[in-house]
Amino acid sequence: DEGLKKLSSIGDGYNGFHGIGMMASMGKKANISTFYSLQNEKNNSWNHVVGVNVTSKWKKIKVGVTAIENISKPTQAHVENDTKNEPQSEKRGTNTQALIGANARYNYGKIDLWGEVAVSQGTKWGIAGITGMRYTPVSDVYLLAIYRYYSPYYSNPYANALCSWSRMRDEHGGYIGLEYNKLKNWQLSTYADVWKNGYEVMAQGDWLPKQNYHMHMRFRVKEKDEACTYSLRWNM
């Protein structure tokens, strides 16, 4: 939602952007950016991507809209690897995909609200949405709450949002986190993430008595698809 950046990284080597882009300001409150990417791979595969982003700021509100058109001819090996967890109707892959998203952020004192909704058009339309709130009651104390929903047919190779899987697909859940940094030389954090097929709970403490000394301890419990794992890590 920020338009073009000097340095960025997206996905793997296949999903990276290689091309040109430009950004223009529309007064002091808005800017528009656009880009075009062309990538040729071995085995006669190629990928064309064109996109546009418009972002506007007004007092404490920021809104943005992004549209991307992706036309590609992936290799058969990439299709099989990229779609092995997708619904059967999508395993053939698509040569053309449209992505449209809108986002908004609002700050009210100690509360920061944000959200984003997007749709993807491939063999079927899919929708995804994520919204969250960050509350800072006092300095160095942060509370975070997030809710997400990704439909089974949503597909976006460029997205990198909160998800229990590597791909944003067929999931809905809630996340609550706390960070507490008011103790001298200590950084404490914890979170709980619950989705339809599992959950994850984590507690972490970092002790930094000196600039070149760091002690780190983390405890995590995770259940995913009826498989439960426990982990305890201690680093010095």
Specify the residue positions occupied by each region the protein language model found.
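Signature for the C-terminal beta-barrel architecture of outer-membrane proteins
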Residues: 3-236
